[in-house]
Each structure stands twice: as structure tokens, then as C-alpha cells.
Amino acid sequence: MIAGIIAVAFEKPTTKDFVWPCWGPSIHVGGISFCMNFVFFLLLLAMGIYIALFYLAFRRPKTIPGRLQALMEMGLEFVREQIVMQMIGPEGMPFFALLSAFFFFIFFANILEVLPGVNLALTSRIAFPIVLAIVSWVTYNAVGIRRHGFTGYMKLVLFPPGAPIILYFLLSPIEFFTTILVRPVTLSVRLFANLVAGHFLLAVFFLGSIALLSSAVTFVFGLVSGAMAVVMVGFEIFVSLLQAFIFSVLSASYIAGAMASEH
């Protein structure tokens, strides 16, 4: 009975549901169209939230901070102590701005998922996590090359200190693929997959609640589904914060590894 009601209420998605049309004229470069659409609007929205909060918090900083300034200072202190100092140490302070930007911007991009009227995390579009992962990848490799030189950095990557020489034929390819190829993939896919999964769960519970509440027979189940949807909203806020933290911590650990004399 319940399955039948849900099946009747369910409208099968089409490919059009995954394509956002342009809101105005587009620019074509090499067969690729660039235009303002819903996803680009989300990027501007996340950037706007990021800039506005920091501007409002620190435009007139006070010795005794107000609520917003205290909240943002608490967030920056968290990044400095729990990410920069824990993963890299005092030498990591030049990367404090980058890691803070990762943490806050990813969180604001993630939290759009539970914002009424938006309900789509910017990071649930794979292109955005890929760009962030590339920035992280370029940063830690540039740090390693600058610290050790290209040859010295490649030596540290390909020949881990302390390993028996006979194992290098096995370890060197693994280290190369892990450091140079796998890390940006895992960084981007981890962030993307977690936010997509959360989006699907929210959609299932909210749409299931609407479908079940439409019938007296399944009304109680609709209430349960609606309650679970509310719980999932809170859980997704936690996941949004957690994924921002994980991305920033991993980026910091990669930078620390590139700076170290030994892996």
C-alpha cells in the first residue's frame, strides 16, 4: 500500500533536471559555454556570505568583541590551533590564510544545501571540489619543490627514507601515484560524494513525507519521514562543518609532508 502510494506520487527525473539553463547571454570558448545560471549564482552567493561575514565582523574590530566578531575570531582560532599548529606547526603560519579560506568557504558552500529556497550544496557539483583540490595540489607540490628543489622533492616522494632498498621498486610507484595523482582525486571525490549523498537523503525524506502525508492511510509514516527530514537537516549541518574541516586538515598534512625533510 505504502509503496504504491509513493510510486504514484513519484515523478521520475529526466536529464533536464540535472541541467541548469542560462539566465542570460552566454560566451562560447572552444565549444564550452559560460553563462550565469543557478550553479554560478550559488558560487556568488557562497562568496557573498564569506565576504560579508568577515567584513561585518572586522570592519570595526573592538577590544571587547561583539557576537559576530567573537564568533569569527573563534573560527579563526580553531583553524590556527587545530589545523595549522597541529598539522604543520609554527612554520605553517604563512598558510593560515589559505587554510582558513578553505575551511570557511567550503563550509559556506556546503551549508547552502539546507538553506530554504536553495537546497543545493555548491560542492555537490564535482567541478567545484576539483578546483579546490587542484589549488591544494599545486600548493603542497610548490612548497615541496621550493623547500627541497625539484630533484630533492622527487627523491623524497619516490624514495621514502628508512625503507629497504629492495622495496623501492614497489614503494616508488605507489608513492608517486599517491602524492602526484591520487591525492587530488580523493580530496575532490570525498567532498563531492558526501554532499551528494546528503542531498539525496534530504530529498528522499522530504519528498517521501510529502507523498505519505497526502493519504490518510500513510499519514503517520509521513510524520515520521518529516521528523527524520528535520533530523537530517541538523546532521547535514554537522557534515558540512566536518567536510570543511577534513579538507583543510588533509591539505595541511600534505603541506607539512612537503615541508618535512623526511616523510
Task: Please tell me what each predicted stretch does.
Residues 1-263:
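Selective transmembrane helix interface/packing segments
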